[in-house]
Regions:
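N-terminal Rossmann-like dinucleotide-binding module
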Residues: 1-53
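Alpha-helical elements of Rossmann-like donor-binding domains used by nucleotide-donor carbohydrate transfer enzymes
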Residues: 18, 44, 64-67, 76, ...
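Short, Asp-centered acidic motifs that coordinate Mg2+ and/or phosphate
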Residues: 33, 76, 157
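Beta-loop-alpha module in the N-terminal Rossmann-like domain of NAD(P)-dependent dehydrogenases
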Residues: 56-119
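Rossmann-like NAD(P)(H) cofactor-binding subdomain of soluble oxidoreductases
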Residues: 85, 105-109, 128-135, 140
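Rossmann-fold dehydrogenase core element
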Residues: 115-133, 153-157
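Predominantly a Rossmann-like dinucleotide-binding segment in NAD(P)-dependent oxidoreductases
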Residues: 133-211
Length: 211
């Protein structure tokens, strides 16, 4: 693979704007294409992102997802589609030899997630989820602090919570309130963070019980 990682964004979800910026700021990534079911919507997304965080070579707009999966100038795809739609496109991307970054929660079930990660492993491509804080410079420092017995004793219980105040416009139409598109609801959307943090603290030792 070339030193520059060429990204395709599969969907024009709002969170994709943040990752467009992250790719631009990474120093070794570029966005080469954005796909939506409607090419005009993809172009509108590109125009908005280019106005704020421009790439030297403007990414192209694609109508439909299959074309971006098959594109020769895309090494990796970012998939912020609703959870209920992700499995199909993660597997298609893996089978096309593309690395995958998938928003969380990655799948609607453990079985689906195993199919997705197995497809990536079989095609020797990377699979990552969209939890940003695990890549922060703070995490190695936190790991070192937790592993120092003079700082923390034996951990036997962890309580965690994550919430936000949803405004009326969120409650009126955000896809995260759709049981079909987001069947795990707030547990999948927010619980993914707290569960990941808990597992990190425990060095990914599985819990004995949950309440």
């Amino acid at each position: 693979m070339a030193e520059t990682l060429r990204w395709g964004i599969l969907s024009t979800a709002g969170i994709a704007c943040k990752n467009w910026e992250a790719i631009r700021n990474s120093g070794n990534g570029v966005v080469t294409a954005v796909a939506s079911r409607d090419a005009a919507k993809a172009q509108q997304f590109i125009d908005g992102c280019q106005a704020e965080v421009p790439f030297e070579d403007v990414p192209r707009a694609i109508g439909g997802y299959d074309e971006i999966i098959a594109a020769d100038d895309v090494d990796a795809v970012y998939i912020p589609l609703p959870t209920g739609l992700r499995k199909e496109w993660v597997i298609k991307a893996a089978n096309a030899g593309k690395h995958v970054m998938c928003e969380k929660p990655c799948a609607v079930s453990h079985a689906d997630l195993m199919e997705m990660t197995d497809a990536c492993a079989a095609n020797d491509v990377q699979f990552m989820d969209g939890i940003m804080y695990v890549h922060s410079d703070r995490m190695p420092k936190l790991r070192a602090a937790l592993d120092n017995p003079s700082n923390v004793g034996k951990i036997t219980r962890i309580a965690s919570a994550f919430s936000f105040c949803a405004p009326p416009e969120f409650l009126a139409g955000n896809i995260r309130l759709s049981s079909e598109l987001e069947p795990a609801g707030c547990l999948g959307d927010l619980g993914w963070y707290t569960i990941r943090a808990t597992l990190f603290v425990m060095n990914f030792e599985m819990p004995k019980s949950l309440r």
